[in-house]
């Protein structure tokens, strides 16, 4: 049963909601912490459908939160997996150049890595062949030794166990319904919450608007799918990624080494605009109001060509199907053929934040809050990697807001 009162109420049971709850309990051990998750278990959305790649942190400019938090997040999550005995593959990542036009992008990634202290190695084409014989590159490539792979569902399950051990009330199957005079309305009754922490992912903007925030922001969902290699298909020793278009928050179709010890791979993801927030498969979870609102917004972006949306949409159409994905991946790794990739993995939804005033996608983490509530509005990749460091950073921001109130009183 839901408690009638709680000091901190966290909405959302993904990896960030769990680490936020744990960090709140660690810093305010004498306070009660309750977490709401509308699904029957935690981590059934973005966290459980994550690629499992622990990013090193060299994609981001030094002035961003992503750059500040990813390197430490990588270290802490890898150490957590070792401590708990969870699967961890320190396979590294190659970023390859498809042609001469990609070389300046490689140089920029190396510069960003140096600025944020992320270890990187610029390799010649011969060095690349020794590291991963199947990788294809033009002249040179960038290698990230700190990039790794984990099993997201096992990480989430371990954090749920940690929350239980810390006396955090984890309420699954209990949905947030809104804010009222008596407290927070949920599907299990009203909870009088001293402070609300919103980590609701796809619905973070809706929860935030109940508290007067997210006025200029809306969640724009993107569907991501991977193709899985058939059993016995050739594997790779390391992840192989293209040089991304740094103006957009997507890393492009890549070849990802899966856990399991055999080097088996998956290729993807797609990045198709979704028409409703939980458009995973078929018409399940269809919401007409969401579909109408999101479709109208996407048509407007196409008409205005916001942030190069037309080019992004056209590129996605070319890689949306199985053959398109295989063709893009074959440009990165030799020996990738359609016959070896017949199965789709679970669909994931990226809860990408859109600034509706400036008509642009938010590239960095975004949050808003006051002395009554705090809202994590943009927690997209690499938020899984950053979970521990991001939670520590955000709880510090929450503490500052609470300290102002305490000092004033």
What is the predicted role of each segment?
Residues 2-16, 34:
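Beta1/beta-strand and adjacent pyrophosphate-binding region of the FAD-binding site
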Residues 5, 87-97, 109, 122, ...:
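Helix-loop-beta segment of a Rossmann-like dinucleotide-binding subdomain
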Residues 19, 185-288:
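Flavin-dependent oxidoreductases
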Residues 25-48:
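Glycine-rich FAD pyrophosphate-binding loop
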Residues 52-127, 131, 138, 252-254, ...:
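Dinucleotide-binding Rossmann-like beta1-alpha1 core, especially the glycine-rich loop
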Residues 61-72, 96-105, 142-161, 314-324, ...:
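Short beta-strand to alpha-helix junction loop
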Residues 126-129, 218-223, 228-230, 303-379:
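Flavin (FAD/FMN) cofactor-binding core of flavoprotein oxidoreductases
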Residues 141-195, 199-206, 388-399:
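Helical element adjacent to the flavin cofactor pocket in flavoenzyme catalytic cores
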């Amino acid at each position: 049963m839901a408690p009638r009162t709680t000091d901190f109420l966290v909405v959302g049971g993904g990896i960030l909601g769990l680490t936020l709850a744990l960090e709140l309990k660690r810093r305010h051990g004498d306070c009660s912490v309750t977490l709401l998750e509308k699904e029957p278990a935690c981590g059934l959305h973005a966290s459980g459908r994550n690629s499992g790649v622990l990013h090193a942190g060299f994609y981001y400019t030094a002035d961003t939160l992503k750059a500040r938090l990813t390197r430490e997040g990588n270290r802490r999550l890898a150490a957590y997996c070792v401590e708990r005995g969870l699967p961890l593959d320190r396979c590294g990542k190659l970023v390859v150049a498809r042609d001469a036009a990609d070389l300046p992008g490689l140089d920029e990634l190396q510069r960003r890595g140096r600025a944020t202290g992320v270890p990187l190695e610029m390799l010649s084409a011969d060095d690349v062949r020794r590291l991963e014989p199947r990788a294809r590159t033009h002249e040179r490539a960038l290698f990230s030794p700190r990039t790794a792979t984990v099993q997201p569902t096992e990480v989430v399950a371990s954090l749920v166990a940690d929350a239980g051990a810390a006396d955090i009330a984890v309420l699954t199957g209990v949905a947030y319904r809104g804010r009222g005079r008596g407290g927070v309305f949920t599907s299990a009754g009203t909870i009088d919450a001293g402070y609300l922490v919103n980590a609701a992912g796809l619905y973070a903007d809706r929860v935030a608007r109940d508290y007067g925030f997210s006025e200029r922001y809306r969640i724009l969902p993107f569907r991501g799918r991977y193709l899985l290699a058939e059993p016995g298909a050739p594997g790779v020793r390391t992840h192989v990624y293209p040089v991304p278009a740094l103006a957009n928050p997507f890393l492009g179709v890549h070849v990802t080494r899966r856990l399991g010890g055999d080097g088996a791979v998956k290729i993807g993801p797609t990045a198709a605009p979704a028409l409703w927030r939980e458009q995973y498969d078929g018409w399940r979870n269809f919401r007409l109001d969401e579909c109408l609102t999101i479709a109208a917004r996407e048509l407007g972006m196409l008409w205005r060509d916001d942030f190069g949306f037309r080019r992004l949409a056209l590129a996605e159409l070319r890689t949306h199907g199985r053959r398109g994905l295989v063709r893009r991946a074959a440009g990165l790794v030799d020996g990738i053929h359609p016959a070896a990739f017949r199965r789709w993995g679970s669909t994931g939804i990226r809860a990408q934040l859109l600034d509706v005033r400036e008509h642009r996608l938010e590239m960095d983490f975004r949050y808003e809050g006051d002395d009554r509530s705090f809202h994590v509005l943009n927690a997209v990749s690499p938020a899984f990697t950053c979970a521990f460091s991001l939670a520590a950073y955000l709880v510090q921001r929450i503490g500052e807001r609470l300290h102002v109130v305490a000092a004033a009183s």
